[in-house]
Amino acid sequence: MPRAPTSAIKKQPLTFAQLAAYDDILTDALIDHVYYWTAIPKNRPLYHPSRGIREEEITKIIQTHLIVDPDLAIAEEKLLATDGLRKFHNSLRTDKEKEDFKAHLRRYISIYLPDCPFEVNATNRFTIDSYEASITARRPIRRNEAIKYLAGTQVTVTPEEEAQLALRKKDFSLVVSSRSKLTSLFMGPARFANHDCAANARLVTRGSAGIEIFACRDIGLGEEITVTYSESYFGENNCDCLCQTCEDNVANGWKPKDGTVPVHRSIEESVLGDDQGYSLRRRRRERSVSVAGSRTSSVTPDIRPRIFKTAKNRAMASDRASTTDSDGIDVVAMAVAAPKRNFDTTALSSPPLTPAKRQKPNHYDVVPLPLGLDVSRDSSASGPVDSLIATEDEKSTATQATTPEFEEPKPPSMREKPLLSPEMSPMKEGATPVGALNGERDEPTETGAPLSVLPTTETDLPEETLDIAATTPSLFPSSECSMTANDLPEHITPVSEPPRLTQEGKSVARQDSQETIIEESLAVPNSAPSQIQEAENNAQQGAETPVLGASSLTAEPHNEVAPVISAVSTKKKKRRVSEKPAPEPVRKQRVPGDYTLTPLLLAQPETAWIHCTNCNTAFVQSDAYYTRANCSRCERHSKLYGYVWPKTAPAGKNDREERVLDHRLINRFLHPDDEAIIRGRKPWRERLGQSSSSLAPSEERGRQRESGTPQGTPGDNYRRSGRARRASAKAMAQ
């Protein structure tokens, strides 16, 4: 007899790559594109949102088939028919992959059912400047109750994959099993539950890869649902943990480095203390739109609190810290805010550089090159060269298009002494100046650049070109600049220097068959040593400083034009940096409550911290020209369910509350009167001296009829205005 086939084949478990791909596209489509005010972190390093996922289409399906008329099968079919999810579903090869994707889809769409006891929220507790997902209860949950729809699936992660996730900082959903001690990555709505050292819920494994969450104690309305990841998830013994429990106990990541624990002021001290005294500089807000309706600003915070950005103002406001849900938040903001920047007032002593005050071509703020030669700056700017440059300076000044008027030419004694070689080239530490060389090498220099040589005959370089090149070097890219020996001043004479010898005893200068290069040096008067010494000190600082090109005046015995040797670095010399261990990044000291009502999130103009009028939660509103009435969580809930948070469905047949499913019909901002009150102003009706209940009726246009005057009717002798009807003289004449 043939062997009977096995009853069932073991299903192949999901891999990490498959589960990460499913979760990324589903969180993008069903969370980020459903009125969510931030974005869920993705598992893959590069994730590009699908263009076929449109917010209006997704939210309409969820509202119609999951909230108003719940039906998971129809909602799943409608969502898979959208462009983005349909393309991804069709790209899956096997039926097993498609079924796994649909099962993961059903986990996410179930969180929008009216009987779901939680809602996806966001928090910036762990990173102040960015938000992460969290889970908030929207109805009371009893102890040992399975939190409905807060489930997921898990996959075992290898140590190599765990290291890659930690390197990319994507290890936010890793848990360690208490039995097998294996690391697993869990996905689905359960991944949004954050860690807490004294969590109110626990993770329970169901089946081979399922995860459910049970309540460990009673969870109240609006409380965050948390679980415990592991004993050493945030460092050894969770020494870097930033959960709510550690914040309340000022432990682990919230523990101060010096060991001092801040003391919170009592309610009686803050209410009855001297902070309630009269102040001329503080406007008393007698009206408050807070939920509790209390007139004491220290007990119930204002809807739009004033956040001080300077350390001085924050120190003055520290004694008036609030003792409600935002306890000590004003005190917290002081520790994390950067000090005020000191502006440099020296930059304002002179007007800024404008096109009309552009620097002249012959004015250069140049550091002299330490050539090792005695070169005088004063001697190089005298004689016919001075007059030639001065003439060219006047021409260049007159041709500037942005110059409003001509400047009067200065006498020669008042003009600045120009340099003959204004070509700029980088100078590095250890580079040998060309002026110190006495010959030409075929090999490259220390900087790796060969020496460039000009022709030695007068016919190769006309005199006209020499004059233009010497006077207007900024108009030509060439760095060579030369002059004849006849143009030298009388007190400067060409001096020949014998070629130096290398260590092998060979001459540096070489005789070529076509060209002969002899480098000359100039004598320097006694007035220049201080300038040369200062330049040498600047060159030894190791910083890369733009200096003049290493070109020198040369001459030959027969008064021919001497070539100029210019060393241009083509390759930058790599600096030798000592390999020192990189210093460890200094961990910023966290202070309890520093993530809310902090000035760090108010960098943009017209950005303000607002207290929600529904749940009293503080949130940041950008472009707060008009104050929003609700936080992002309450506003998202109202758009989806049509009710104020946390209501999701009608209470019964006798529920008469109107359900507004079109969110465009709801005004999301405060009333103008409330807006004026929270900003410390009087409502406009009071400013005009009128109340909203007793407004004067608007006067009718035209002449008013006196009392007792009969109103005219058709056919009588009275007009409609009440005046007597008289016949015209023209009609009577006829």
Swiss-Prot record:
GO cellular component: chromosome; nucleus
Biased composition (Polar residues): 527-543
SUPFAM superfamilies (UniProt xref): SET domain
Catalytic activity as recorded in UniProt: L-lysyl(20)-[histone H4] + 3 S-adenosyl-L-methionine = N(6),N(6),N(6)-trimethyl-L-lysyl(20)-[histone H4] + 3 S-adenosyl-L-homocysteine + 3 H(+)
Basic and acidic residues: bias regions: 407-418, 578-587
Sample GO molecular function, one term: histone H4K20 trimethyltransferase activity
Single Gene Ontology BP annotation: methylation
Domain SET: from-to ranges: 116-230
Enzyme class at the top of the EC tree: transferase
Stored Pfam families: SET
Compartments (UniProt record): Nucleus; Chromosome
Protein EC: 2.1.1.372
Annotated region (Disordered), positions in chain: 343-459, 523-543, 567-591, 681-734
InterPro entries, sorted: Hist-Lys_N-MTase_N (IPR041938), Set9_fungi (IPR025783), SET_dom (IPR001214), SET_dom_sf (IPR046341), Suv4-20/Set9 (IPR039977)
Assigned keywords, A-Z: Chromatin regulator, Chromosome, Methyltransferase, Nucleus, S-adenosyl-L-methionine, Transferase
Main location: nucleus
Coiled-coil stretches noted in the UniProt entry, renumbered to this chain: none
Similarity field: Belongs to the class V-like SAM-binding methyltransferase superfamily. Histone-lysine methyltransferase family. Suvar4-20 subfamily.
Protein role: Histone methyltransferase that trimethylates 'Lys-20' of histone H4 to form H4K20me3.
Protein name in the entry: Histone-lysine N-methyltransferase SET9
Gene coding for it: SET9
